[in-house]
């Protein structure tokens, strides 16, 4: 049986590597080892200078030091962790978790046999809890820098020439000039602006402003039905705002599988969030204490003007390389201002590499982290690896949404013969006992080999459950392989096992 699995997995691994997302290039591993020519000569020159202290940058810096490279990290924010830790992933999860607890206590305890009265929101305390989490984690990265002997330069970096970076110090730090044999650009991304709409972070806000509102708005309009928009919309809806999501596309959720997107719209709508899909924003301007918004439905060309207390602009992010001096060096960039690199993260100046949001691929913190490790390993050891078919994505609404691999739409477009297996959380014993059983797991497999191609789920703790699916895809597992693994009972993970069984043999046990 093992031999057949190995042969099947090897065959499908070759086939599946051709299914790269257009923006992502496959990481290639060199067979031969290189000499450690990346090491500095000991004259004050660094082996590695990482520009940017976000998830990709700080991880690259730590890994570089662990591999024996004399490393310095330059960060202009004043705190490490980048957008993710300071004004993104981490503070948003704090608000998502605490707003969910509040909403559950206020609206979902009576049926559980818990009588509660007098529940209210202390927004300032909720914001303090968020800020405390951020502060703890940012200081934790500084500790890791010291532990691993990574030097930390607080300031704004700009290339003087391909070997030299000028750093203008901030927060009392001195200006300095850094010479290094290798550079990694990890400057991340910034909020994508909407033409004609001015973000003041008070009435018209980006995700940054939405994390720090001083009061719960009565009405909030969210421009963009992607991950950021729906997460922040969920926070403020739970706290009492009337939230309307305006989405240009026919469906919400961006790149997620169509079936999961439909389930998400249905479930989130029941929570009180309104959706206006196939709708474009024509204008938005502050009018006294409110924002006047004009939109147009692209299906019937009907226009609508209304007032909202806060407008959140969440239409995505764009690479950030401002002031770095890349044009002076002649570093190649594409039309979207992304730095172009090869399979080893090298720009057209080979000793300058780039990772994360500043280059191609999904703008995800964990993708940047893996690229940071791979880029440093290419420098120090001559080989690195990131499997771009196995980058999971998670939306932390309730229920959570998570996916890895290709969607059913992508399988159709690629001409792949495939099978589908699904299993609803309403048939999962742990979800039922938790009274939290909305959603499903959907598995896509190669019809000829049973090899996993994609796993998509919406349901309780989906962000934690997707790890098993990602591991299975990484190692070329079949649906049968996962279905035959004993899963503890009662657990939410049994829903994954049952969906795998449905994909493999056509039938699950409990549905």
Curated annotation (Swiss-Prot):
Disulfide bonds join 84-89. Signal peptide: none annotated. FAD binds at residues 75-84, 93, 157, 187-189, 357, 363-366. One of its GO terms (molecular function) is flavin adenine dinucleotide binding. GO terms for biological process: 2-oxoglutarate metabolic process; aerobic respiration; glycine decarboxylation via glycine cleavage system; pyruvate decarboxylation to acetyl-CoA; pyruvate metabolic process. Homodimer. This is Dihydrolipoyl dehydrogenase, mitochondrial. It comes from Schizosaccharomyces pombe (strain 972 / ATCC 24843).
């Amino acid at each position: 049986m093992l031999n057949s699995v190995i042969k099947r997995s090897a065959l499908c691994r070759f086939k599946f590597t051709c299914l790269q997302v257009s923006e992502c290039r496959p990481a290639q591993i060199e067979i031969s080892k290189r000499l450690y020519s990346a090491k500095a000569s000991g004259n004050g020159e660094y082996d590695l200078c990482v520009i940017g202290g976000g998830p990709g940058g700080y991880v690259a810096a730590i890994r570089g030091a662990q591999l024996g490279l004399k490393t310095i990290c330059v960060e202009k924010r004043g705190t490490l962790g980048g957008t993710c830790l300071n004004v993104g992933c981490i503070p948003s999860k704090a608000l998502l978790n605490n707003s969910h607890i509040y909403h559950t206590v206020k609206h979902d305890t009576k049926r559980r046999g818990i009588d509660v009265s007098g529940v209210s929101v202390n927004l300032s305390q909720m914001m303090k809890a968020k800020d405390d989490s951020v502060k703890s984690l940012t200081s934790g990265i500084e500790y890791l820098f010291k532990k691993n002997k990574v030097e930390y330069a607080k300031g704004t970096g700009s290339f003087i020439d391909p070997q030299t970076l000028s750093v203008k110090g901030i927060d009392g730090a001195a200006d300095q000039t850094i010479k290094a044999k290798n550079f990694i650009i990890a400057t991340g991304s910034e909020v994508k602006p909407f033409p004609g709409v001015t973000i003041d972070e008070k009435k018209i806000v980006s995700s940054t402003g939405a994390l720090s509102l001083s009061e719960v708005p009565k009405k909030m309009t969210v421009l963009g039905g992607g991950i950021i928009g729906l997460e922040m919309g969920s926070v403020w809806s739970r706290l009492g705002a009337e939230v309307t999501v305006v989405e240009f596309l026919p469906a919400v959720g961006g790149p997620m599988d169509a079936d999961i997107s439909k389930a998400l719209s249905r479930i989130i709508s029941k929570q009180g969030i309104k959706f206006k899909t196939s709708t474009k924003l024509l204008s938005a301007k502050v009018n006294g204490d409110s924002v006047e918004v004009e939109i147009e439905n692209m299906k019937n060309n009907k226009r609508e003007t209304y007032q909202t207390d806060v407008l959140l602009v969440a239409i995505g992010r764009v690479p950030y390389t401002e002031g770095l001096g890349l044009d002076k060096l002649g570093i190649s960039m594409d039309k979207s201002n992304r730095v172009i690199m090869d399979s080893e993260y090298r720009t057209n100046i080979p000793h300058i590499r780039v990772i994360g949001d500043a280059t191609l691929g999904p703008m995800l913190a964990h993708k940047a982290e893996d690229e940071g490790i791979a880029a440093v390993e290419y420098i120090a050891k001559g080989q690195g690896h990131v499997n771009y078919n196995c980058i999971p994505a998670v939306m932390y609404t309730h229920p959570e949404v998570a996916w890895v691999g290709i969607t059913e739409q992508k399988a159709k477009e690629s001409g792949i013969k495939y099978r589908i297996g699904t299993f609803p959380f309403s048939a999962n014993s742990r979800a039922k006992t938790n009274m939290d059983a909305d959603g499903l797991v959907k598995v896509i497999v190669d019809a000829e080999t049973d090899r996993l191609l994609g796993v998509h789920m919406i349901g309780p703790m989906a962000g934690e459950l997707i790890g098993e699916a990602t591991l299975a895809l990484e190692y070329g597992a079949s649906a049968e392989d996962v279905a035959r693994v004993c899963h503890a009972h009662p657990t939410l993970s049994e829903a994954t096992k049952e969906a795998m069984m449905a994909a493999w043999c056509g039938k699950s046990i409990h549905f």
